[in-house]
Amino acid sequence: MRVLAIESSCDETAVAIVEDGKLLSSVLSSQVNIHRKYGGVVPEIAARKHLENILFLLDEALDRASLKIDDIDVFAATQGPGLVGSLLVGLSLAKGLSISLNKPFVAVNHLIGHIYANFLSFPDLEYPFLVLLVSGGHTEILLAEDWNNFKRIGKTRDDAAGEAFDKVARLLGLGYPGGPEVELAARNGNPIYRFPRALNEKGNFDFSFSGLKTSVLYFLKNNPEARIEDVAAAFQEAVIDSLLTKTFAAAKTYGINKIVFAGGVAANTRLRERANEIAKEKDINIYFPPIEFCTDNAAMIAMVAYEKAKRGIFSPIDTNAIPYLSIVSL
């Protein structure tokens, strides 16, 4: 079974093809350089750029897989969450192809796609496992009990971790997107300052990063002589410490010995280093997607679509975008 999937939930336009769960091609066009001057994604511009790029990427994905459009058995696209204008570009194309070629259509939850990015490298990964989903818009700890059964056991009460990186990057005068910029600065810094870790009570697996952001703001006002690199390193350590302390504690509480990392922040090198150190201490198996599949891509969407399609689970052609789709929906 060949599945062609489209991802257009935010500012990356992507198309990928999998055959029986194996990746044949994956292409992507990023808009990061376009949105950088605005300090964030401009929805209207993002949707317009998706329209400009999507057909070229469709042809390129087919060419790289040495396939024609008639060779595709199932078409899929991200349904949400995301920017509604952006989502509609991918959904409209996938549904149009489905109608014109009389092939099934599958709508995919973008967040579950991030989890499934791990199956690209670890196809034999078995349930149950714990998930730390950490990105620009979401920070959650989930118990994955089966391919379509996700139980949320912790979430952010305010800012997502990736959002905190972006906001602190602006405070530090760094560029966009904030995550890579803060990480780069932190490599040349020393985490000599101590920023707060919120919600530390035992058994609480929720996160909070707004207070951390505010703490950095006031620290910079009161300590203008502080090196940006040191502040970046200290902030990064605070975020990573909070993420990993709660995630490994949740694994112990629920008796799970496998932790899967997902989302754009999972590309952070320091997060990976610390996670590996703790995992060795606690004898827990951890899984990270390849760096290129941590951020938005269509390969992860195709993997979810394949799992649904092989079970005969398809979506109605009048499926619409759901900008605030929850991960507990599939």
Swiss-Prot record:
Recorded catalytic activity of this chain's protein: L-threonylcarbamoyladenylate + adenosine(37) in tRNA = N(6)-L-threonylcarbamoyladenosine(37) in tRNA + AMP + H(+)
Gene Ontology biological-process annotations: tRNA threonylcarbamoyladenosine modification
Top-level taxon in the UniProt lineage: Bacteria
Residues spanning the membrane: none
Protein name per its UniProtKB record: tRNA N6-adenosine threonylcarbamoyltransferase
Cellular component GO terms, alphabetical: cytoplasm
Chain residues that bind substrate: 133-137, 166, 179, 268
Stored PANTHER family: TRNA N6-ADENOSINE THREONYLCARBAMOYLTRANSFERASE, TRNA N6-ADENOSINE THREONYLCARBAMOYLTRANSFERASE, MITOCHONDRIAL
Taxonomic classification: Bacteria, Thermotogati, Thermotogota, Thermotogae, Kosmotogales
The organism of origin for this protein: Kosmotoga olearia (strain ATCC BAA-1733 / DSM 21960 / TBF 19.5.1)
Similarity comment: family membership: Belongs to the KAE1 / TsaD family.
Pfam family for this entry, one: TsaD
